[in-house]
Regions:
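N-terminal leader/targeting pre-sequences
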Residues: 1-176
Length: 176
């Protein structure tokens, strides 16, 4: 299976992503930034995440939330109005569509490629992707005990902001 999937994976990553998000840090984590690119792949989506400025090396919860945009509220340490984890079929945690594997940071940087068959790119356009301060424990309801929101980005069709195509951790960032 891997021998058959790898060429498709490389072909997919050589294309432009369909949905993108630029991650910004919360008021308590202003140096956190990054990008997430989403590609259609098999029966779902392939997500590529590159996040810098994480507070420490370790694990962080990583979830798609119900709505965007990500707005930092005055006097509020997270992001306002993004709702709970994305769950169109109202599944309990960790089975809802917005559940993603934890981000693993080393020297304040995390890079991840993950496949999900729980959604296609068009279903997450306009929704928020959130980095949480603690790792998801995959048990506690409704959020996996992943703590506060330290970073957030809103998914948009990539062509709207003319992103550069990702080419790995050393690529150019999205234009401002």
């Amino acid at each position: 299976m891997l021998k058959q999937t790898m060429p498709l994976l490389f072909e997919t990553l050589s294309q432009y992503p369909v949905v993108c998000a630029r991650i910004m840090g919360s008021q308590l984590n202003p140096n956190l930034k990054g990008e997430v690119w989403v590609y259609p792949f098999l029966e779902g989506s392939l997500l590529v995440a590159d996040i810098q400025g994480l507070p420490f090396s370790g694990f962080y919860g990583f979830h798609i939330h119900q709505t965007g945009p990500c707005v930092v509220g005055e006097g509020y340490t997270g992001f306002r109005g993004i709702g709970g984890h994305y769950s169109p079929t109202e599944q309990p945690h960790p089975y809802h569509s917005g559940d993603l594997p934890v981000l693993m940071a080393y020297y304040n940087h995390a890079f991840m490629i993950v496949y999900s068959d729980r959604f296609v790119p068009s279903e997450i356009t306009g929704r928020a992707i959130v980095v949480h301060q603690f790792p998801d424990d995959y048990r506690t309801q409704p959020t996996g005990d992943s703590g506060g929101q330290i970073g957030c980005g809103t998914f948009y069709p990539c062509f709207e902001k003319n992103p550069t195509r990702p080419s790995g951790p050393a690529r150019t960032s999205l234009p401002t």
